[in-house]
Structures are given as C-alpha cells and as structure tokens.
C-alpha cells in the first residue's frame, strides 16, 4: 500500500518540527521527525493499525466519520484514511486539540 501525505499534513508537520527545534533543540526536532515519520511509514504494511477517530474529537463530526482513522503518537494525533491501495495522511494535531472536519480533506 502507498502512504501519501496531504499538503495540509506536510505544512502542519513542518510547523510542529520547527516549533520543537526552536523550543528544545535541533536534535529533538530530528528525533520527533523520525519518530512520527517512522510510525506513519508502518501504515504501508499495517494500514488498519490505527483506531477509528471518535466523534468526540471533532468540533462537528463529518458525515463520513467512519473513513477516518488515527495514530496516536503522544502528544500528537495523526489522522488518515484508506482509499483503495492508498493510505492518505490528512492531518497531525495535538491530542488535546479538537479536529475540524474541513481540515481533513485530501488536497493533492
């Protein structure tokens, strides 16, 4: 299975890593990049490893909530969907943040 990242996810991920580098260290940024990227790469072989995203995680749940899955890489939540032979990584947010449904659309 192919694992692809949306532009929205890429922007969020870059911001998170940049924040870690500024607040902590370059080495911590690299460590988090590898940790999160490594977990996401496992989706190629184990696309169902993430749980369904609970409705309570949304400001307003989408009508097609069942399509969304999540990987918890504490303190972050990576949201993805499976479409055919493609695993689409849609967003990454802190677990304490509510998800906004219009930010979970495929944009590539």
Residue spans for each PLM region:
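Enriched for short, Lys/Arg-rich terminal
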Residues: 66-77, 81-108
